[in-house]
Amino acid sequence: MELVNITCLGLGLAADAFAVSLSSGFVIQRIKFNKALKIALFFGIFQAIMPLIGWLTGLSFREFMTNIDHWIAFILLLGIGSKMIYEAYKEMDDDDKFNPLDTYTLLALAIATSIDALAAGLGLSLLKTSILLPCTLIGLITFVLSFIGVFIGHKFGSIFNKKIEIIGGLTLIIIGSKILIEDLIKPI
């Protein structure tokens, strides 16, 4: 697979992680390098590992995964997005609010945004190509875009305050819905 094609694949797969990083940046109160790094590492590592998992499982697991992957992503993003919107309206202690730095939340977000990368790995297994370069580039591109996305999101979050939490939650729900709809309406 050519470098240009792999880069384009990486950019396409990183789009959801970038959008979720923006949403995460919206709600982070005091931005620090290590906070953005944690989010970027979760997304980058998952985006790098999922194509490898997809590639290794190949065709035997492909049919099962393609039947449920969109539902998993949709449910995770719908739940997290709804929680963000709920918390924007409800008066809560800071300890109870949506925390994009919570390890379990990050794990759910990383899985939800990397399911497409798993499917891409399944597709790459059909090409009988090496998986090392695609995994590395996909992970690096996602890491960089996610890292930048947290800072951009934080900048806008500090300007718009609570409204941005609602926008962030809606963004997650829209991404989840997009994943679900695209998989449900694709030709058989």
Curated annotation (Swiss-Prot):
GO MF annotation list: manganese ion transmembrane transporter activity
Keyword Cell inner membrane: yes
Physiological role: Probably functions as a manganese efflux pump.
A GO CC term assigned to this protein in UniProt: plasma membrane
InterPro entries: Mntp/YtaF (IPR003810), Put_MntP (IPR022929)
Keywords: Cell inner membrane, Cell membrane, Ion transport, Manganese, Membrane, Transmembrane, Transmembrane helix, Transport
Localization annotation: Cell inner membrane
Residue ranges crossing the lipid bilayer per the database entry: 8-28, 39-59, 68-88, 106-126, 131-151, 164-184
Species per Swiss-Prot/TrEMBL record: Crocosphaera subtropica (strain ATCC 51142 / BH68)
Family membership: Belongs to the MntP (TC 9.B.29) family.
A Pfam cross-reference name: Mntp
Membrane topology per record: Multi-pass membrane protein
Protein name listed in UniProt: Putative manganese efflux pump MntP
